[in-house]
């Protein structure tokens, strides 16, 4: 049996569609599972933040309580797998604790989205204690699914982990929800859909707007929109992407990027830096090395009357097959390059 531990639902983020699509896949494949979802009601996010740290901690504690009750009542048995939609999960060590005392052969698997092992991630300031927590995660887990080789290599460089546990699968983009918005007439709209935080450098988008207008004397009448500043429904957001000509990122941290993946599927020209995950996911796309290049790329996109070809970054069914059909691995040793090299 699969014990499925989803993320809390946050409207406007990938958590809602991922939960829906995972359940649809499990039902279609006739996979026996129990979903640990204490509530689908989520309070509004604090202004400027993409999660509510207090609520997500409470939500995860409720999930641990439900899983503990399943261990206590004997509903979890040898051969079962516990799958976390985000394995960076405070309290996950209690699963290993219960496994030890019940002597149940239960696999722990899940997706690693980010962590303090990335120097430019917003949680980097927690590394003093978070690195110990992350080492626990990598120790007690059987298989950890990575969105990209970029994050996998980051983990191997910075944490104690058996590399064989880390499996690159990509993430499931909600293409079915995007199809309705394809084929719209393109307008001179440039989009920045990253979070408004230091690691995404939104102020460079302001400078981009200034320099594009200066170089074209404002003759392109372009709109530069930060979607996080707009109060858009999911449908309105997708419609805006469908009408836009370019999607821009100045990210200093990105392990996958749902927002860019959605935009390029809807025919936006990607204007992306030549770093992080972007060379891996967009190998046939011109990427910029200097800010000035991004200005020229946006002007080129705005002047073009041809629609940029739609791109598919990942196949959701392939991702789900890897998550739920692949046998989990049992690690043989821990590995950390800096220690190995000293021996």
PLM feature spans:
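Short hydrophobic beta-strand element within catalytic cores of glycosyltransferases
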Residues: 269-272
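N-terminal pre-catalytic "stem/leader" segment of glycosyltransferase-like enzymes
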Residues: 1-91
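Conserved donor-binding/catalytic core segment of Leloir-type glycosyltransferases
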Residues: 174-210
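A charged, aromatic-enriched C-terminal amphipathic alpha-helix characteristic of glycosyltransferases
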Residues: 292-343
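Aromatic "clamp/platform" in nucleotide-sugar-dependent glycosyltransferases that forms part
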Residues: 251-252
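Donor nucleotide-sugar binding/catalytic pocket of nucleotide-sugar-dependent glycosyltransferases
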Residues: 139-179
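Membrane-proximal helix-turn-helix segments that form the acceptor-binding/catalytic region
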Residues: 124-144
């Amino acid at each position: 049996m699969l014990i499925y531990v989803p993320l809390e639902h946050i409207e406007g983020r990938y958590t809602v569609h991922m939960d829906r699509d995972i359940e649809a896949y499990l039902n279609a494949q006739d996979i026996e599972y129990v979903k640990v979802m204490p509530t689908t009601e989520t309070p509004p996010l604090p202004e400027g933040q993409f999660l509510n740290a207090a609520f997500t901690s409470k939500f995860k504690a409720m999930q641990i309580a439900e899983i503990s009750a399943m261990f206590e009542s004997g509903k979890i048995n040898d051969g079962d797998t516990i799958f976390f939609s985000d394995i960076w999960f405070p309290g996950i060590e209690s699963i290993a604790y219960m496994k030890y005392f019940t002597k149940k052969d239960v696999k722990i698997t899940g997706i690693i989205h980010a962590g303090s092992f990335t120097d430019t991630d917003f949680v980097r300031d927690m590394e003093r204690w978070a690195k110990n927590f992350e080492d626990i995660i990598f120790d007690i887990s059987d298989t950890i699914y990575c969105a990209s080789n970029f994050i996998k290599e980051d983990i191997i460089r910075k944490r104690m982990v058996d590399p064989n546990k880390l499996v690159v699968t990509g993430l499931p983009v909600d293409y079915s929800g995007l199809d309705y918005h394809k084929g719209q007439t393109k307008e001179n709209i440039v989009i920045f859909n990253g979070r408004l935080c230091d690691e995404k450098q939104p102020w460079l988008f302001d400078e981009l707007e200034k320099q594009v207008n200066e170089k074209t004397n404002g003759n392109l009448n372009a709109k530069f929109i930060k979607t996080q500043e707009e109060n858009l429904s999911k449908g309105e957001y997708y419609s805006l992407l469908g009408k836009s000509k370019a999607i821009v990122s100045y990210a200093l941290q990105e392990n996958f990027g749902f927002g860019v993946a959605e935009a390029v599927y809807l025919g936006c020209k990607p204007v992306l830096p030549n770093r992080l995950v972007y060379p891996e996911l967009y190998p046939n796309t011109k990427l910029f090395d200097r800010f000035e290049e991004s200005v020229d790329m946006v002007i080129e996109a705005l002047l073009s009357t041809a629609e940029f070809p739609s791109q598919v970054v990942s196949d959701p069914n392939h991702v789900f097959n890897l998550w739920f059909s692949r046998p989990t691995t049992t690690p043989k040793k821990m590995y950390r390059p800096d220690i190995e090299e000293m021996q």
